[in-house]
């Protein structure tokens, strides 16, 4: 690293909120940056700075203290915004204003801002669209993880590169023994062990959860055991716990995974190797499984999920936005029955596509290395 006063790399995103997908993105960024940047020069803007300092040994400050950011920016050479879906206004345009404002400040202080491996949208408000467009114009480089985001930027005449989610590059770390033992207790001969990832969503009602239960009871072997995966506890457990109760009432076996010993997202990658199939709504549950060659059955609560499932040729349960539940069980039953007939084939397709996704994801880090080299 240079002795230039501008030596810091700032990383901003939805970090420190207990969302495993965002934490996996952060871990992948830190692990790549460590190859060329000293740990004390990497700073995470976090909702839980002490946690990130302890786990990764990097610097971290509260994302809510503007004074901390303003103190760091004069020393920052690179400002990474992402990845994930930061520029969206599903609840309010506040997120677009917050992250866009950071990019504007970074540019004003002479740092090199990059929108990194993001999925842009949905953007329904005029404020959200304006804030996102301005942030994109002020960013010196942009990589996006899906074609819809690229098309949006092209429509705005803003240059960007299509890459892939950085988590495709995240190598596994050792799984704590206690976590592996939890799953191994469910094993009995050739019994199928199925991971299940659900989350609260406007288009996943109690009725649709009941339909999913019915479909899995009909399509999975009678001795199949469920391992319920809370990737973000407050959003996931309200769906997972009643599902497990109903599953057990039907005479089936399963458990909610105790995740307290899982400190790093990369340990979840190792966890996937203990499963034979993953049924998931969450994007990163699907990515963790697919990158390890584990077949998946996905529920498309969001367009980004459908994009990955189609890319990897995995069976899809379409979640309509609203209404249309009359034929939903039959549609899901048809999709699951056809899709799950050959798990070995699905696993082979996963492995084949994961390699190309990893290569595409590496483009994000090649760009970072190039920027850092120029800035040195």
PLM feature spans:
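Active-site anion-handling motifs in enzyme catalytic cores
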Residues: 1-376
């Amino acid at each position: 690293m240079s002795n230039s006063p501008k030596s810091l790399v700032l990383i901003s995103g939805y970090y420190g909120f207990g969302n495993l997908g965002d934490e996996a993105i952060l871990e992948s960024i830190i692990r790549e940056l460590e190859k060329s940047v000293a740990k004390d020069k990497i700073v995470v803007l976090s909702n839980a700075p002490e946690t990130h300092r302890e786990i990764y040994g990097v610097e971290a400050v509260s994302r809510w203290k503007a004074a901390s950011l303003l103190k760091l920016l004069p020393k920052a050479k690179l400002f990474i915004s992402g990845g994930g879906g930061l520029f969206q206004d599903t609840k309010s345009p506040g997120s677009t204003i917050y992250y866009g404002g950071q990019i504007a400040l970074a540019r004003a202080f002479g740092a090199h801002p990059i929108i990194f491996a993001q999925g842009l949208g949905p953007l329904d408000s005029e404020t959200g669209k304006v804030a996102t467009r301005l942030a994109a114009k002020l960013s010196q480089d942009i990589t996006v993880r899906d074609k819809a985001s690229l098309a949006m930027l092209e429509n705005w005449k803003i240059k960007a590169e299509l890459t892939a989610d950085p988590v495709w590059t995240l190598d596994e770390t050792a799984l704590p023994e206690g976590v592996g033992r939890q799953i191994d207790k469910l094993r009995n001969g050739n019994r199928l062990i199925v991971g299940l990832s659900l989350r609260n969503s406007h288009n996943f009602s109690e009725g649709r959860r009941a339909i999913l239960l019915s479909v899995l009871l009909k399509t999975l072997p009678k001795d199949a055991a469920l391992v319920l995966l809370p990737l973000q506890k407050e959003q996931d457990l309200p769906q997972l716990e009643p599902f497990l109760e109903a599953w057990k009432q039907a005479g089936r076996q399963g458990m909610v995974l105790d995740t307290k010993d899982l400190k790093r997202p990369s340990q979840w990658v190792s966890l996937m190797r203990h499963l034979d199939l993953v049924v998931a709504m969450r994007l990163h549950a699907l990515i963790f499984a697919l990158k390890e060659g584990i077949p998946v059955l996905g529920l498309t609560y969001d367009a980004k999920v459908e994009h990955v499932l189609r890319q990897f040729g995995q069976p899809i349960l379409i979640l309509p936005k609203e209404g249309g539940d009359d034929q939903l069980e039959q549609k899901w039953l048809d999709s699951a029955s056809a899709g799950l007939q050959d798990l070995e084939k699905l696993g082979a397709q996963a492995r084949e596509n994961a390699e190309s996704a990893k290569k595409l994801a590496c483009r994000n880090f090649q760009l970072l290395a190039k920027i850092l080299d120029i800035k040195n």
